[in-house]
Swiss-Prot record:
Name of the protein described by the UniProt record: Transportin-1
Function statement: Functions in nuclear protein import as nuclear transport receptor. Serves as receptor for nuclear localization signals (NLS) in cargo substrates. Is thought to mediate docking of the importin/substrate complex to the nuclear pore complex (NPC) through binding to nucleoporin and the complex is subsequently translocated through the pore by an energy requiring, Ran-dependent mechanism. At the nucleoplasmic side of the NPC, Ran binds to the importin, the importin/substrate complex dissociates and importin is re-exported from the nucleus to the cytoplasm where GTP hydrolysis releases Ran.
Species whose genome carries this gene: Arabidopsis thaliana (Mouse-ear cress)
Keyword set, alphabetical order: Acetylation, Cytoplasm, Nucleus, Protein transport, Repeat, Transport
Keyword Translocase in record: no
Amino acid sequence: MAATAVVWQPRDDGLAEICSLLEQQISPSSVVDKSQIWKQLQHFSQFPDFNNYLVFILVRAEGKSVEVRQAAGLLLKNNLRGAYPSMTQENQKYIKSELLPCLGAADRNIRTTVGTIISVIVNIEGVSGWHELLPALVTCLDSNDLNHMDGAMDALSKICEDIPHVLDTEVPGLAERPINIFLPRLLQFFQSPHASLRKLALGSVNQYIIIMPAALYNSLDKYLQGLFVLANDPVPEVRKLVCAAFVHLTEVLPSSIEPHLRNVMEYMLQVNRDPDEEVSLEACEFWSAYCDAQLPPENLKEFLPRLIPVLLENMAYADDDESLLDAEEDESQPDRDQDLKPRFHTSRLHGSEDFDDDDDDSFNVWNLRKCSAAAIDVLSNVFGDEILPALMPLIQKNLSASGDEAWKQREAAVLALGAIAEGCMNGLYPHLSEIVAFLLPLLDDKFPLIRSISCWTLSRFGKYLIQESGNPKGYEQFEKVLMGLLRRLLDTNKRVQEAACSAFATVEEDAAEELVPHLGVILQHLMCAFGKYQRRNLRIVYDAIGTLADSVREELNKPAYLEILMPPLVAKWQQLSNSDKDLFPLLECFTSISQALGVGFAPFAQPVFQRCMDIIQLQQLAKVNPASAGAQYDREFIVCSLDLLSGLAEGLGSGIESLVQQSNLRDLLLNCCIDEAADVRQSAFALMGDLARVFPVYLQPRLLDFLEIASQQLSANLNRENLSVANNACWAIGELAVKVRQEVSPIVAKVVSSLGLILQHGEGVNKALVENSAITLGRLAWIRPDLVAPHMDHFMKPWCMALSMVRDDIEKEDAFRGLCAVVKVNPSGGVSSLVFICQAIASWHEIRSEDVQTEVSQVLNGYKHMLGNSWAECLSALDPPVKERLARYQV
């Protein structure tokens, strides 16, 4: 007779002890040290069957409170995430066998905890490792018992949310994919009388819109019918999910809703006014999604007269908006740590860049007001001035509303003006002077949120005001806006300070040299703000100072200005420790100042250089031994310090020699070039390139190491994270090549091979990397044409196409020296790409270097001579503007 498998049983004393610990852990009144309890629980985790105890307590300890059972379940969930793969098969099997019968537990808290644990296990081993799971879920869903249906739906919804693809894969032993089994049941639950089932079913199906499995694609009609049935569901959470479904379908598969577009738009317009703000917020997302999906704008156009009033109405602050709570906060209240937004330093990048870099205030809560303003902004960009007839009368009406109780309507009208400033500028431009004249007094409004929004809206009109500054009235208005924003920098209200400072930074970017006559006044206001702001707004002042330096460059390098600017910054610099995160924005600020002042930064350079070195060394120590360093490792310190050193190199030029000569920067930099963090490597290669330009001799002792490590970045996996690293490494190799010449020979073949691949797949990488690859390839070809020419046929066409996009400058001249050099070595290798060579040459507006001009002419005339009668055939394939530009070479 076969032996019966022994089922695991807990020991009573162990069970009692664990339950006691869990009770103390969750008790609000427990006087016991919670950290000690946690340590004991962690100690128990080392026993192989500890997780069996936890599942037993969750599922079977009916004499214990639901809270204790739930705590056991949550601890089990966390343990399984790390420990499940290394558990014995018996223990894995026991836990799974205990969970499934509990899907229909009477208490919903127990059911949902079980559902969470099931999804964790499925995340680890898929559904093929748990044969009993899918039949158990189907049985519960088909049971007609609410507890069982709800428990199974909860578990299924978590699987759909966390790992949707797992149900859309082939499972051994199953005739069809799990999604084909579950989707009809989920769609059926749309009609359930139980709100919880309707919500879970709809939420589960929505998870599949992005990946759109065949099962859902083939059931789209049923899905859409179900959405229309649920559209007016009494439960707000269900209506919210209906809106989310329409938004996602619009984004992912707009053709699916086109036949129903009018009904969907009518519905979205209706629920945009839903009494539940979360529903109206989800509905509001639809209008931007519609425009982004490039659905026919004329369908939306007829809705504008009804839609725009709703959006404007929703742009007013809600009574419970958190901004209202802190709107009265005055400058004397110190910032708490939680008031500080997370900050993200962007590592230095060489070349034009086409990644998004929106500072979109993502830290703040997204709400109906912001979403409605974003929708108006998008509509203004799609329809331009066509929205003005519906919008402007409402804005004027709101702006003229008097009385304190109408301040929210006035504020929303100012926000709307700012939102349409770019999209509707043609229609607004004739009235620009009146609009600005109306906004200026609002900078002194008694309501701080009106003062702050007026700052933002004026900054949105800034670039157009600057265009008008050529005429006396326009210049006078520009000055008034400038002075108005500077005055608000010194507001006593923190929100207004923040808005004014951000708005001023925007105006600085647009105005550039127009700021020069006002530099003294600007610096006095900025440094006065610097002296009075709390920590959070201080970061924005640093940004405004840095932006000012970027905008006016060497104009800042005057003793009178430096006397205002530098002493407070230096004092703050000395006050902060090397591990204080408030150093980050100051390091960034000094980077901009050092680049702007150039050699004018020399008096401040030595202590700044040494501080950067100290910070990098401290962090490299903290990485391996935090206790010895007395600081926790944070790579942002290294990135900011490397970028400031790059700024010094760029600003001081060869003057950096005296700083780096006796330092160990070379070894520190080499370490950073091999760091596992992409942003550290990105900044390290930027500094390597800057040093190569101004003081290449310093890199000489480790030259081959630098070149080898840089070349490795070009053959790495070029995902989004590594693209910018590869870009800077590529640029640095090119800078080194023109300085050390023949010494780059050992890496030429490897780099040329990598650059050829990058150029061939240019559509998969960003513009900066393509341009830098074309330039560096040209520089290597110039120095070692003999090594590059044999491989011309691999990259000639994409290389020439990339060079056509590079703007005229010294780097382009270098690249063309290389192009001409390889063609001279291997003229026949360029014949098949001759049309592209001609287009690249024609991309020059003017070649300033006489020797490059001569070499280009020799290449063209060489091919003309070599091809004889075929030359005319080659020219006939060129566009007329290209032929016209080539005519200057007498070909």
